[in-house]
Amino acid sequence: MAYFRLYAVLLAVASSVAAVKVNPLPAPRHISWGHSGPKPLSDVSLRTERDTDDSILTNAWNRAWETIVSLEWVPAGIEAPIPEFDEFPTSTPSASAAATRSKRANVPIQFVDVDVEDWDADLQHGVDESYTLDAKAGSDAIDITAKTVWGALHAFTTLQQLVISDGNGGLILEQPVHIKDAPLYPYRGLMVDTGRNFISVRKLHEQLDGMALSKLNVLHWHLDDTQSWPVHIDAYPEMTKDAYSARETYSHDDLRNVVAYARARGIRVIPEIDMPAHSASGWQQVDPDIVACANSWWSNDNWPLHTAVQPNPGQLDIINPKTYEVVQDVYEELSSIFTDDWFHVGGDEIQPNCYNFSTYVTEWFQEDPSRTYNDLMQHWVDKAVPIFRSVSDSRRLVMWEDVVLNTEHADDVPTDIVMQSWNNGLENINKLTERGYDVIVSSADFMYLDCGRGGYVTNDDRYNEQTNPDPDTPSFNYGGIGGSWCGPYKTWQRIYNYDFTLNLTNAQAKHVIGATAPLWSEQVDDVNISNLFWPRAAALAELVWSGNRDAKGNKRTTLFTQRILNFREYLLANGVMAATVVPKYCLQHPHACDLNYDQTVLH
């Protein structure tokens, strides 16, 4: 009986995909294939009802078509049943059907006809990204309809994965196809950190290329941190004295370049200046008095005295009035460069001991002994948030959840500020949505892409352990996290299987606007950034675009396997240096590397 149930599941899968080799990622919300046979493509031209010369749409189509032609893509990972079963039924038609196919195949696709309803919709949060794509039997055109240009761009990236080589120097769509598609969540992002280590503009472009192909639409750019300040500020050019070198800086032109490159691919860039914690470099060059504890020992070895969770310490002085003058100047200058309505202003990991080094803060506490660190955080919110809102009526702020949920928190944080949740998984998502905050999910236990690679702090005596102290219990060097605070490593399966709205009410679930996978860069630079983002970020991309469940509500992780393995090869073909995730044997032998023989084990 178990054998029959498993075979039935696989047969259902086989019947849905047997006709085609392609397996686009993220999987469209709805896709249906015809049966009349391959549709050849000639030199396909873009047609619209509007003059689109030099527009985002025209340029996007030109890139897509150039990619299609130059790659002559052949899918590398094809879905098939677990090896013990017979091969999938072939899509070979009867003789009469073959004759019909041959006749229809004589009409090559020559055009992509795009109908956009709202050409002027800006690339901001909540913009409509839906599209339909139709390639009908006997038609010489692919029809794309979209509410906005941004939806049409997604149609192009889907089409790129559908058109493949015919093996004889030509290009084909394997069958007529109809797609109706739209994202589950409006916010689908990656976070890059250029404060711990510098990332070149070239490598930022590479990440944006991968994001566009997988329909991720937000680059959260954590610009700086205590370790370095790489961003040129006209108002305070001395801030880049705390860049790692003159070469490792971003000019205004560099910032605009990244914003423009992203926008051309339907991706928003949301900058983050992390404040008031994680703030030494740059700020201290303007005035050392606006930074507390910058010259203290971070004191992990004597934790009760610690001033930071990692080297080096430094937090903006919340009580010093000049702090807010400098913050306003820096914030307004960067707001003029980054065009998105949203801006991330940090708010995480305040360390109370740091303010023992501030005369301003210690005197403030002495003035009123009833004051607490919660009052200090509220002072920051009350003084800083009006500055952050002042640049635009459409400005919306994002903060890390600590400002609300940390031991040291502000008691009154406006609920129109978006909270990015990184700690305690479902528990914190529940707390935030219950209070009415919109939430970006970045749970470290599922989505932190830097985790599980050991520690980086040096002179660490914990590694000096020659024998296993307790073979029955995992420890630091024996089966434990080995210095990575958020270990283990987050595999694509860990990311894809995250049900981050689990147990939320419908009202709470509506407050979850999407997710971002952060890659903190303590151990990341140009050499390995793409390997650490990709292809794992593609698991997040499908999770927030079309979900991890099928129409019956069952987890579809086993069906996603070949899709992500194939997509890794597609990323490489497009110049995105994605990491190896399996022996190539697994790619070429679908499900032969599964842990569980039962393909329904995740349902």
UniProtKB/Swiss-Prot annotation:
Optimum temperature is 52 degrees Celsius. This enzyme can be produced in large-scale and may be used for the enzymatic synthesis of complex type sugar chains containing GlcNAc and GalNAc as components. The active site is at residues 225, 278, 349. InterPro entries: Beta_hexosaminidase_sua/sub, Glyco_hydro_20_cat, Glycoside_hydrolase_SF, Hex-like_dom2, HEX_eukaryotic_N. One of its GO terms (biological process) is polysaccharide catabolic process. Gene3D superfamilies: Chitobiase/beta-hexosaminidase domain 2-like (3.30.379.10), Glycosidases (3.20.20.80). The record marks 485 as: Essential for chitooligosaccharide substrate binding. It is found in: Secreted. It is an enzyme of class 3 (hydrolase). Glycans are attached at residues 356, 503, 528. Its EC number is 3.2.1.52. Residues 1-19 form the signal peptide. GO terms for molecular function: beta-N-acetylglucosaminidase activity; beta-N-acetylhexosaminidase activity; hexosaminidase activity. It comes from the Eukaryota. The keyword Disulfide bond applies. Optimum pH is 4-5. GO terms for cellular component: extracellular region; membrane. The record marks 309 as: Important determinant of glycosidic bond specificity. Disulfide bonds join 293-354, 451-486, 586-593. Keywords: Carbohydrate metabolism, Disulfide bond, Glycoprotein, Glycosidase, Hydrolase, Polysaccharide degradation, Secreted, Signal. PANTHER family: BETA-HEXOSAMINIDASE, BETA-N-ACETYLHEXOSAMINIDASE. Part of the binary chitinolytic system. Involved in hydrolysis of chitobiose and higher chito-oligomers (produced from cell wall chitin by endochitinases), thus contributing to the formation of germ tubes, fruit-bodies and septa during hyphenation. Hydrolyzes synthetic substrates p-nitrophenyl-beta-N-acetyl-glucosamine (pNP-beta-GlcNAc), p-nitrophenyl-beta-N-acetyl-galactosamine (pNP-beta-GalNAc) and 5-bromo-4-chloro-3-indoyl-beta-D-N-glucosaminide (X-GlcNAc). This is Beta-hexosaminidase. The gene is nagA.
